[in-house]
């Protein structure tokens, strides 16, 4: 493997990772590399947190053996315009692509392609696997979540956690599918342009802070058998415009 920070702040510009390397530890290639390639027959399986931090590469093709990607793998890779993810990848973190899809990055930055057969897909700028909405990568004004998605993960549209504050004003509407059963904590925190939300009939769990600080949210309709609206952060905390709320008769607890 290549250990943590092995090439940190190196003046090297090009590197070919030997086929024998199975793991890149955190910040393993942190530096000014303009070219990163992988030897034929690569056995690489794991890429650690911020592994390519600050690199000046414009494109990257990961080997077909890679299984997992850590946190903020492409952090501050402002020249990177193309990443190809193989179908072998089965583990991606919520923030794997954070600070790669950056409002301050070079124009065109943020093109991720998943190989045919991958369990992951990008649709309208949102990253999914077969059942989960993982994270928004490229913010849009209107999002329709496809049928079949059961879970919206924590921080999925959290405008505070994406490192790009301008996104707070982007999302104006989102349509949720009937298949949805759970919304994670802080899922839509600080989506300040969101004006209304209808939570479908099969949703039984809404995490704390899910819609907190959605300052334009005026209408919220909860149709599912939710029993609690609790958490360390209130589900609708800071929703100053909220005037119309429909709650289910299954609700037994509101608070923290």
Residue ranges of each PLM-predicted region?
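Eukaryote-biased recognition of intrinsically disordered, low-complexity regulatory segments
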Residues: 131-137
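Structural signature of tandem-repeat unit edges
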Residues: 1, 10-23, 32-46, 55-68, ...
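Consensus positions within tandem repeat domains that build extended binding/scaffold surfaces
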Residues: 3-6, 25-28, 48-51, 70-73, ...
């Amino acid at each position: 493997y290549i250990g943590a920070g092995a090439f940190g702040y190196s003046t090297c510009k090009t590197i070919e990772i030997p086929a024998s390397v199975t793991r890149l530890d955190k910040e393993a290639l942190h530096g000014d590399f303009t070219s990163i390639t992988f030897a034929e027959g690569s056995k690489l399986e794991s890429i650690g947190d911020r592994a390519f931090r600050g690199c000046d590469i414009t494109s990257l093709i990961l080997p077909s053996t890679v299984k997992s990607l850590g946190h903020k793998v492409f952090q501050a890779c402002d020249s990177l315009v193309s990443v190809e993810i193989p179908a072998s990848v089965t583990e991606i973190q919520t923030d794997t692509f954070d600070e790669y899809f950056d409002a301050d990055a070079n124009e065109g930055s943020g093109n991720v392609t998943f190989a045919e057969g991958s369990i992951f897909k990008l649709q309208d700028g949102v990253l999914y696997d077969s059942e989960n909405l993982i994270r928004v990568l490229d913010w849009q004004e209107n999002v329709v979540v496809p049928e079949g998605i059961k879970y919206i993960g924590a921080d999925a549209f959290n405008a505070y956690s994406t490192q790009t504050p301008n996104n707070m004003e982007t999302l104006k509407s989102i349509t949720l599918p009937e298949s949805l059963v759970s919304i994670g904590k802080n899922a839509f925190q600080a989506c300040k342009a969101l004006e209304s939300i209808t939570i479908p009939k099969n949703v039984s769990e809404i995490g704390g802070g899910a819609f907190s600080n959605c300052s334009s949210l005026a209408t919220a309709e909860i149709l599912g058998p939710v029993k609690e609206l609790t958490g360390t952060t209130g589900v609708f905390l800071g929703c100053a415009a909220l005037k119309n709320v429909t709650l289910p008769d299954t609700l037994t607890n509101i608070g923290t």
